[in-house]
Amino acid sequence: MTLFRTLLVALAASVLAGCGYNEIQSKDEAVKGAWAEVISQYQRRADLIPNIVETVKGEADFERGTLTQVIEARAKATSIQATPELVNDPAAMARFQQAQGELSSALSRLMAVVENYPNLKANQGFQDLRTQLEGTENRITVARNRFIKATQDYNVLVRQFPVNLTAMVFGYKQKAQFTVENEAAVQKAPTVDFGTKK
């Protein structure tokens, strides 16, 4: 009887070792860590915006509409609670991504409009903020890429047999992923014309 129990325990241990639970835990933590980095970089960008807005406000005839768009987009982006659970809710993730995309677009328009204001372009404080913003945008891209990779690794794992059975038993589901904005437009190759066609 003791031999039977020993064999049963050994069999159970080997089955549990091969079920992938520990690997699911590891990949899940990697996704959470990568997500925390994404949030940290988005927060860094959000923290820079008030300084940029105040610097730009100093330019008396600056286009207020563009500035208002940036302020409103920042308010919308920071109103969405970016919790670790957000990656488990595709609809919430889509809302978060849309708000961050709108903020990126508003900032891009602001930087384009700034080109029309030589005094602002020459302002060292603004140039420093602009450099910090560009660096932050690069960090956001790196953090998003790491998150995409971690999420992809996790999602592949929880769909593979026999780990998918363990994932199902313990309630692990695929995680929401960042999507490409304007996916159809990105897939279509651009038409390049150097003025040679007549």
What are the residue ranges of the model-derived segments?
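A helix-centric hydrophobic-segment signal that preferentially recognizes long
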Residues: 2-198
